[in-house]
């Protein structure tokens, strides 16, 4: 998926640690959500290879989204990965690590809407007879 031999520089490691603190203290994320978001960001930064996460622009983020959509992820997983990236860049912008937020227009894939399940007339009658 990505080159795991490429090491993140110390600054990016610090961004991730600060981001995890932000998610814990200010967003009150659960440990599970925190771990998922951190993993998503590490994967993204490793995918960037030698480019700093602070230099990525909207086109680079879209390129990453096209990359992850080639895998057999559920739409909910892709939506979470996008949410992770959007939250990360919002954090970087808020902390003034970047001058503009390239993820502000990034949108998640639409989740399919399903129709509600309904009772058959026989099931309704059976319920009414048992009351």
Region roles according to the model:
Residues 125-131:
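Short, intrinsically disordered, charge-balanced linker/junction segments flanking boundaries
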Residues 2-6, 17-32, 38-115, 130:
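N-terminal core-binding DNA-recognition domain of tyrosine recombinases/integrases
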Residues 118-119:
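Two-component histidine phosphotransfer core
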């Amino acid at each position: 998926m990505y080159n795991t031999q490429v090491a993140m520089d110390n600054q990016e490691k610090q961004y991730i640690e600060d981001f995890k603190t932000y998610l814990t203290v200010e967003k009150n994320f659960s440990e599970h959500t925190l771990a998922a978001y951190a993993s998503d960001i590490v994967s993204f930064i490793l995918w960037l290879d030698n480019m700093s996460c602070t230099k990525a622009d909207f086109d680079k983020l879209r390129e990453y989204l096209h990359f992850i959509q080639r895998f057999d992820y559920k739409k909910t997983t892709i939506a979470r990965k996008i949410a992770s990236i959007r939250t990360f860049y919002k954090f970087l912008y808020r902390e003034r690590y970047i001058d503009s937020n390239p993820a502000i227009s990034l949108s998640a894939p639409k989740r399919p809407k399903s129709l509600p399940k309904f009772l058959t007339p026989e099931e309704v009658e059976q319920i009414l007879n048992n009351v």
